[in-house]
Curated annotation (Swiss-Prot):
It comes from the Eukaryota. This is Profilin-1. The keyword Ribonucleoprotein does not apply. It comes from Solanum lycopersicum (Tomato). Its main location: cytoplasm.
Length: 133
């Protein structure tokens, strides 16, 4: 299965039969290289990925300044140190799951809930971890 298929079929899927979808999603390498992304995934800056990686290595690094993706600031909320970073901005937010080799991004807006985004991103992330990625 191609990386793009994971994004198209597993990240940008209909969530729990609600007819709702994430706003955008991507799978990136630790260096910020794009393995696959939805057409509207934001154009991020390399230093934003560097800061996200630093937060995985040093949990809490992003808390004082916020998480930035394509210049959009998200308030960092409870995650799983070294494994998941979650951010909130108004009625939407972001979930980032770190696997052995990749970062799985899911960005959402209402009516998608934070819990639904977490479920979608972390489910595919856990699957990729189990597959050695």
């Amino acid at each position: 299965m191609s990386w793009q298929t994971y994004v198209d079929d597993h990240l940008m899927c209909d969530i729990e039969g609600t007819g709702h979808h994430l706003s955008s999603a991507a799978i990136l390498g630790f260096d910020g290289s794009v393995w696959a992304q939805s057409p509207n995934f934001p154009k991020f800056k390399a230093e934003e990925i560097t800061n996200i990686m630093k937060d995985f290595d040093e949990p809490g690094h992003l808390a004082p300044t916020g998480l930035f993706l394509a210049g959009t600031k998200y308030m960092v909320i409870q995650g799983e140190p070294g494994a998941v970073i979650r951010g909130k901005k108004g009625p939407g937010g972001i979930t980032i799951k770190k696997t052995a080799q990749a970062l799985i991004f899911g960005v959402y807006e209402e009516p998608v809930t934070p819990g639904q985004c977490n479920m979608v991103v972390e489910k595919i992330g856990d699957y990729l971890v189990d597959q050695g990625y």
